[in-house]
Amino acid sequence: MMVIFLGPPGAGKGTQGKKIAKKIDLPHIAIGDIFRTIIKTSTSEAELINNYVKQGELIPNEIVNQVIKNFLLSSEYKNGYILDGYPRNLEQAKFFESFIKEKIKIIYFDVSDELLIKRILGRYSCKNCGKIYNRYFVQPKTDNVCDVCGSSTFDYRKDDNEEVIKKRIEVYKTETYPLIDYYKNSGNFYIVNGSKNEQEIEIDIQKILKIN
C-alpha cells in the first residue's frame, strides 16, 4: 500500500503518519524530518536548505525531487509507505509519477489557518524518541517527562515564530492548492477534517484505507 498525506504545516500529517504506518507495518517517510536531518549536517547543501527554511520559503523542486527519489527507490520501501508532505506542487507530482507507477491513495488534511498557527507555535517533541507534544493541547502527563521513554530533554523548533508560520501557510496555499485540484480527479483523493482530535482523525483515515 502506498499512501500520500497532504496538508499545510501543522495539519497533523506527522502524528497520523506515525500512527497509521505502525498499525499497517509500513515505513513513515516524513519529508520535513528528512530535511531537518540534512540541516544538522555541516554541508553546503545543509546551509542552503536552512536558509530557505528560516525565511519560510519552500525548498526548490530540484532539490526536493532528487532527495525523495533517492529515498523511495530504496529496496526497503518496495512494499509501500506512508509519504508525508510530498509532493507539494504540480511539478513535484509529475516528477513523482515519472518513477512511481503504482496506484496511490491521497489523503488531504483540511485545517483552518488559526488552528494551524496555534498547533505549530505550541509544538515540541521529545529529543530521545520523537514523541510530539503541544503546550496548548497535549502536554506530558508529568511535567518535563516524556510519556513514552521518560526522557526530560525536549526539542523546540527554532524556525517556528508566528510571522514565519503565516508565510509558510500562504506559500503552501499558493503552491499546493492547484495540486489539490489536480488530485481531486484521480479517483483516489480523500479529505479528512484535520480540526478533529487525534483519535477521530485516525478513525477517519482507517476507514479510508479500510484497516481496523
Swiss-Prot record:
PANTHER family: NUCLEOTIDE KINASE. Residues 122-160 are annotated as: LID. One of its GO terms (molecular function) is adenylate kinase activity. Its EC number is 2.7.4.3. It comes from Rickettsia conorii (strain ATCC VR-613 / Malish 7). It holds the Pfam family ADK_lid. SUPFAM superfamilies: P-loop containing nucleoside triphosphate hydrolases. Signal peptide: none annotated. InterPro entries: Adenyl_kin_sub (IPR006259), Adenylat/UMP-CMP_kin (IPR000850), Adenylat_kinase_CS (IPR033690), Adenylate_kinase_lid-dom (IPR007862), P-loop_NTPase (IPR027417). This is Adenylate kinase. Keywords: ATP-binding, Cytoplasm, Kinase, Metal-binding, Nucleotide biosynthesis, Nucleotide-binding, Transferase, Zinc. It is found in: Cytoplasm. Residues 30-59 are annotated as: NMP. Catalyzes the reversible transfer of the terminal phosphate group between ATP and AMP. Plays an important role in cellular energy homeostasis and in adenine nucleotide metabolism. Belongs to the adenylate kinase family. Pathway: Purine metabolism; AMP biosynthesis via salvage pathway; AMP from ADP: step 1/1. It is an enzyme of class 2 (transferase). The keyword Iron-sulfur does not apply. GO terms for biological process: AMP salvage. Gene3D superfamilies: P-loop containing nucleotide triphosphate hydrolases (3.40.50.300). GO terms for cellular component: cytoplasm. AMP binds at R36, E57, L58, I59, G85, Y86, P87, R88, Q92, R157, R168. Consists of three domains, a large central CORE domain and two small peripheral domains, NMPbind and LID, which undergo movements during catalysis. The LID domain closes over the site of phosphoryl transfer upon ATP binding. Assembling and dissambling the active center during each catalytic cycle provides an effective means to prevent ATP hydrolysis. Some bacteria have evolved a zinc-coordinating structure that stabilizes the LID domain.
